[in-house]
Amino acid sequence: MPSHRSLAGCAPVRCGLGLFFLAVSATGTLSGQCPDGTPPPCAAAPRVLASAHIPDANSVAVLPFENTRRDTAYDYLSDGLASSIATSLAQVPRLAVRSPSFVRRVSQSAVQDEAALGRRLDVRYIVEGEFQRGGDRVRVAVRLVALPSGTERWGDAYVRPSADLLGVQEDIAREVATRIAGALLPPETRALAARPTHDPAAYDLVLRGNFYLAQRSPAAVRRAIDEYDAAARLDSAYVDPLARVAYADGLIVFYGWDFGLPADSVLARGVAAVDRALRLDSASSDAWMARGLLLTRREPRSYQGVIPALTRAVALDPRNTEAWHQLGTTLQYLGKSAASDSALRRAVALEPDRFITLSNLATSAEMDGRFAEARYWNDSALAVNPTFVSALGARVRLAIARHDTATARAATAALDRDRPATEVPIAMAALAAYDAWRGDTASARARAERAVQVFGDATHVLWLGAPTAMALASAGELDRAMDLLERLQPHGIDMHLFLRLPAFDPLRTNPRFVRLFAETSPPAEPQ
């Protein structure tokens, strides 16, 4: 029987229930294409990109830099250089800079032609380049390409000491901004010249940490924390490593990963780091975002302070896609669907292929009974990641809701295959619901038993325990479903969202369920 660690040691990109609070890096097989060949959101879904085919004149995407030495020890610089240059360019309000994570995913797709890449990214310019690092020297070659013509507007190569990587990025960002927007205004020049740290070694450690954090696995997050801690020791005034350690600690508690510390100790460490970051720089959007995440774990019954923190994060940086996603999902958990949809759509406008956000929009619509809209958002999520177990499960539920046997059967066929342990409860919940709908109680019970066997006693992993209870409820095992729900922890706002799902309708009038539903209800106006 799997232990707590085996269930909680998953890569979140594979284990979602479509109700994730957190966004994840998009690894795995991504198609990024709707059934009609267009990029997501799929055409039938409510559109959020009014200018999808008319890119802003000053729109630009920075592609990951190619490591020409093929030395994997420096792979972290591929995304690190691109993200840092994009972050600098975003300080120029006249530029429309695409999200680095969106650009990374699109650049990894099958699109090769520059013009097609520009259409997918919805930009007029791309920045592309390569680097070689060896010893104490680094060579960076870069060019700015205008689209759709493919004309090179500017190019250069820099050979500098490795310790001057920040200077190289500053020079590139300044040249790109000037070539696109024209002469820079004094505030723009100052913004581009601002450096997060003056310690090159600390900066390098943060880039390494970012590389590991994006992988979203327990081992990689542990490595990221080590890199960030080392950076903070080198430069005690450096805000970025503190904010990211705090965010990483939030991930650890959310996913129930075993790092050898009680959850309360991990939270205390994260809160201390983010408080220190905000004392150094109260205008750090990432620090406010990390604070919001930590408070959902520290205050699971009230979410006290979460909405103000996340609202502050998006106000400070309206291009912070992750903060918009977190704000929208928090509002979803609080039952504020209109405000939630608005924030989630802002995230999708910034990153159209963000399948976790697309899935959350589908969940919101499903809970409100807007099944046609839920279907479109869910199809958009599957267009990006056809193997996403949560969206496949949602496709089954939505097909059942509209009595579409053919679609439900096809979706169950995609679910009913060998899966990692961390996907089994989610898949079994959908399969048990389908079997019960068809009247095959024996098969539904077998699915539920499979979910129970895999889940074991990991009662702190709510996002896998709740689907296990769903499977039991669908199979008619109502007392066992209630027993499991009462054992799951914490009894807070996160649990309440699961309890709102139609899968628990067989328990809706059960006195124990009624008490649990009331106990986990969010406050009317969280502070």
Predicted regions located by residue number:
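TPR/TPR-like alpha-solenoid helical repeat scaffolds
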Residues: 246-248, 396-400, 427-429, 433, ...
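Acidic, proline/glycine-rich low-complexity intrinsically disordered segments
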Residues: 32-398, 404-420, 443, 502
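Alpha-helical adaptor scaffolds
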Residues: 290-297, 322, 329-332, 363, ...
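Sterile Alpha Motif
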Residues: 461-489
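Bacterial N-terminal signal peptides
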Residues: 14-29
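Solenoid-like repeat scaffolds
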Residues: 349, 380-385, 414-422, 450-459, ...
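C-terminal non-catalytic interaction modules
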Residues: 483-527
